[in-house]
Regions:
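Transmembrane helix-loop-helix hairpins at the membrane interface
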Residues: 92-247, 358, 459, 723-728, ...
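Hydrophobic alpha-helical transmembrane segments
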Residues: 142-151, 158-161, 175, 211-240, ...
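Juxtamembrane coupling segments of multi-pass membrane pumps/enzymes
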Residues: 82, 188, 197-200, 213-274, ...
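Flexible metal-binding regulatory segments at protein termini and peripheral loops
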Residues: 1-132, 255-256, 340-348, 753-854
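P-type ATPase nucleotide-binding
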Residues: 456, 460-588, 600, 612-628
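Membrane-embedded alpha-helical bundles of multi-pass transporters
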Residues: 117-131, 160, 179, 418, ...
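Conserved cytosolic catalytic loops of P-type ATPases
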Residues: 32-51, 56, 61, 206-209, ...
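Conserved ATP-binding TGD loop and adjacent catalytic N/P-domain core of P-type ATPases
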Residues: 22, 438, 518-520, 544, ...
Length: 854
């Protein structure tokens, strides 16, 4: 029977390089019931997906058997505990070892090399006693080796477990130099005992004790720099943790009490004064204020809060006194979820890391074989044993599996942290990698490119009315309606401080509008057909309404007491940054497709406003995923939506991006969550992903290039041609800097700016043969709409134009008519072809003289 699958995190100790993490991963995969395991060298952690018969105890035992330590993480731990884990004291420990090593190394190097290389005076005690010099070097080198014994313990343990690591290479290199030098020292003793001072001095030059000590010290320098740099990669997470308030002021038993923030429970009432941070997620009960949410969303403009508004932990109350009810506390707050998401993204592996993983698994054994082969080759060629040994040691100490192992995770860690800082959350490392490969972005119109709620855009009063009187009538009539368009009108009236009158006998007229009595007068509001049926709508107002409809707006006509009051146009307004976002995506070589359930006319109007390239209109919610699937034939697709109504499409896409998530950051369908409602963050997420990918490629190139060039040089490849041999000490110095360079390069991502273009040229956009560009759609719509113009004599006033317009609109096949008194003509938009003679006869029948029709 298969048990319930569970995901658990473990802290892992003893790992020093990529070979270690690869060995731990293999060991855990061998436990029956383990489905998936990811080991992070950067955070010294492991995430395991397993079911029965696997248990946490068995997993820890497997890690222990592999020569390392593991323990389950405390999932419910406080943020302070998590921060303590991130703030490792490893750099401090390494620094202590480094200082002690340098203190011993300096006198060692003075005695062993100072007088030879720089002519420094030799202390009198060593002036004519080579054996004393040798014993002095042995003593100091032994002390350095004891101080850095962890290399030997870790290296030997991993070697005996069949998984040699970087420490194995370091310990073998320094131990070989130490053992060989000790053997030479015995030869010196023998020569000194026999009185052969010249031979003893000759053997002194064959000592490599300073190399053994220098190798360990330089590697420790590299480890220290690496540890400090690795600590900086978690700065983003630590800064998020620092945002959480330590205390909260709650109301219990009618009194205010200050308690630790983690002790607030759901349902508690808490108060927040101006200048204080909000301790937990909640809902405002009373009070009004502006809240700075930039810490969570990256949005610098404060958000107004009123009773009923949601507030989030770690946001700053600026100027009002708020009383709130706690809705999400502890690990459930938005801040905690963001921190967990960044940690999870850093703990997972990107597909690109598999290359380094494969190489790391065989890297150390291969290097050991190369070192042995190099030493043997030089011995066979007739070179002295000391020379051959130096080449083998150089190969061992210059090789660096750490650079390979850190190339990807450090970039992922810094990248995901920078994303969180700017309100862009990547759920996994795969999502962070995949987003940058996006070729086609599909954007849902409503709520993504537009505000998502209708707003009043135009107020066109008829004769005898002004804007305020028309808006008051409309608000009075719509006050009892639940329609979204009605809500837009009542909201506009409220913003204009207009008080609506009481509507009596309210009645909804499905498909047409509403009716009611206001101040004893009959009032109606709705579409053009409703007012036409009452004989109220005149041609001029109808033409104005059609013009508004042509702009993608919904015209609502209002009348009272049988008299037309005017038109109020309502539309879902395009977001202020949508046009700029589309422009940015296009400049990055990304195709944009707008997906909407709206009719073609409205969709094309919006597309024209923002410059989107392609439009798919009249799409039912359930069909959005099918559209995404078709687009995937042409390239990698990212779907952008609200994460709820678009869930199937988000799941179908290569990358699902949920926009404007706010407090709901744990949307299951999305791979990337954008905290703000800004479409520009879509471009920012792609831009950040591309920079992270570029950084990973640079790191991997450096790691492979360094080892591919360094190992042959260390083995002596330059000796036959240039007579250049690499001293083991220089090899150790190169190794110590390689990992530091990789981590430092990743830290450059901290300078990421969301609106800064990526370096390099963008790839040309993919072609979408299955879709017609929006510009062509608009052009074709304009071209295919048949138009005819008839020139008319005899029109004297607006009454005449209205008479002509009414006569022409009565013809079958005529969609709309625009009559110009000044130009003495009428322009007809036709649904079907209408004969010129029919048009001219209609004008004659109306009492006017048509001169030409074309």
């Amino acid at each position: 029977m298969i048990g319930v699958r569970q995901m658990e995190k473990f802290d892992v100790t003893g790992m020093t390089c990529a070979a270690c993490s690869a060995h731990v991963e293999r060991a855990v995969r061998g436990v029956e019931g383990v489905k998936e395991v990811t080991v992070s060298l950067l955070t010294n952690s492991m995430t395991v997906d397993f079911s029965s018969p696997a248990t946490a105890e068995k997993i820890c035992a497997a890690v222990s058997a592999a020569g390392y330590g593991a323990s389950p993480q405390n999932q419910g731990g406080k943020k302070e505990n998590k921060k303590t884990l991130l703030e490792s004291n490893e750099p401090k420990k390494i620094l202590h070892r480094l200082i002690a090593s340098v203190v011993l190394l300096l006198p060692l190097m003075y005695v062993s090399m100072g007088h030879l290389m720089w002519g420094w005076p030799m202390p009198q005690i060593f002036a004519s006693d080579p054996l004393a010099i040798g014993l002095y070097q042995l003593l100091l080198t032994t002390a350095v080796m004891v101080i850095n014994q962890r290399f030997f313990i870790s290296g030997t343990k991993s070697l005996f477990h069949g998984a040699p690591n970087m420490d194995t290479l370091v310990s073998l290199g320094s131990a070989a130099a130490y053992i060989y030098s000790t053997a030479v020292l015995f030869e010196m003793c023998n020569a000194a005992v026999n009185g052969n001072v010249q031979m003893a001095m000759h053997h002194l030059h064959g000592l490599y004790l300073e190399s053994a000590a220098m190798i360990l010290t330089l590697i420790t320098v590299g480890k220290y720099l690496e540890a400090v740099s690795k600590g900086r990669t978690t700065d983003a997470i630590k800064s998020l943790m620092d945002l959480a308030p330590k205390t909260a002021c709650v109301i219990r038993d009618g009194k205010e009490q200050v308690i630790p923030a983690e002790e607030v429970v759901k349902g508690d009432t808490f108060v927040v004064r101006p200048g204080e941070s909000i301790p937990v997620d909640g809902r405002v009960i009373s009070g009004e204020s502006a809240v700075d949410e930039s810490a969570l969303t990256g949005e610098s403009i404060p958000v107004d809060k009123a009773p009923g508004s949601l507030v989030s932990a770690a946001t700053l109350n600026q100027n009002g006194f708020l009383t709130c009810e706690a809705t999400r506390v502890g690990e459930d707050t938005t801040l905690s979820q963001i921190i967990d998401m960044v940690e999870n993204a850093s703990a997972t592996k990107a597909p690109i890391a598999k290359i380094a993983d494969k190489v790391s698994s065989v890297f150390v054994p291969t290097v050991m074989a190369i070192a042995l082969a190099a030493g043997a080759a030089w011995l066979i060629s007739g070179r002295p044993f000391s020379f051959a040994l130096a080449r083998a040691i150089s190969v061992l100490v210059i090789s660096c599996p750490c650079a390979l192992g850190l190339a990807t995770p450090v970039a992922i860690m810094v990248g995901s942290g920078m994303g969180a800082k700017h309100g862009v959350l990547f759920k996994t490392a795969t999502a962070l990698e995949q987003t940058g490969k996006t070729q086609i972005v599909v954007l849902d119109k409503t709520g993504t490119l537009t505000q998502g709620k209708p707003q009043v855009t135009d107020i066109v009063p008829a004769d005898g009315f002004n804007n305020d009187s028309l808006l008051k009538l409309a608000a009075s009539l719509e006050s009892k309606s639940e329609h979204p368009l009605a809500a837009a009108i009542t909201r506009k009236a409220g913003e204009s401080n207009i008080i609506a009158d009481e509507a009596q006998g309210f009645s909804a007229l499905p498909g047409h509008g509403v009716s009611a009595e206001i101040n004893g007068k009959s009032a109606i509001g709705g579409n053009a057909s409703l007012l036409k049926s009452k004989g109220i709508l005149d041609s001029a107002m109808e033409a104005a309404g059609e013009r508004l409809a042509g702009e993608g707006k919904t015209p609502l006509y209002f009348a009272i007491d049988g008299k037309l009051a005017g038109i109020i146009a309502v539309a879902d307004v395009v977001k202020y940054d949508s046009k700029q976002a589309i422009s940015e995506l296009r400049s990055m070589g990304v195709r944009t497709v707008m997906l909407t359930g709206d009719n073609r006319r409205t969709a094309l109007t919006v597309a024209k406003q923002i410059g989107v390239e392609n439009v798919v209109s009249d799409v039912l919610p359930g069909d959005k995923a099918d559209v995404v699937k078709k687009l995937q034939k042409y390239g990698t697709v990212a779907m952008v939506g609200d994460g709820i109504n678009d869930a199937p499409a988000l799941t179908q896409a290569d990358t699902g991006i949920a926009i404007g998530a706010g407090a709901d950051v744990a949307l299951d369908a999305a791979d990337v969550v954008l905290m703000k409602s800004s479409v520009r963050d879509v471009a920012a997420s792609i831009r950040l992903s591309r920079q992270v990918l570029r950084n990973i490629h640079e790191n991997l190139f450096w790691a492979f290039f360094y080892n591919c060039i360094g190992i042959p040089i260390a083995a002596g490849a330059l000796i036959p041609v240039f007579n250049i041999a690499l001293n083991p000490m220089f090899g150790a110095a190169a190794m110590s800097l390689s990992s530091f360079c990789v981590v430092t390069n990743a830290l450059r991502l901290n300078f990421f700016k969301p609106d800064r273009p990526c370096k390099g040229k963008s790839k040309p956009p993919v072609k979408l043969p299955g879709l017609m560009p929006a510009e062509e759609n608009i052009k074709n719509t304009e071209e295919t709409a048949m138009k005819k113009t008839v020139y008319i004599e005899g029109m004297m006033c607006n009454h005449c134009t209205a008479h002509v317009q009414k006569a022409l609109e009565a013809l079958d096949g005529v969609e709309s008519v625009e009559v110009s008194l000044e130009d003495k003509k009428a322009v007809l938009t036709l649904k079907n072809d209408v004969d010129n003679a029919v048009i001219m006869n209609a004008v004659k029948d109306a009492g006017y003289e048509p001169t030409k029709c074309e």
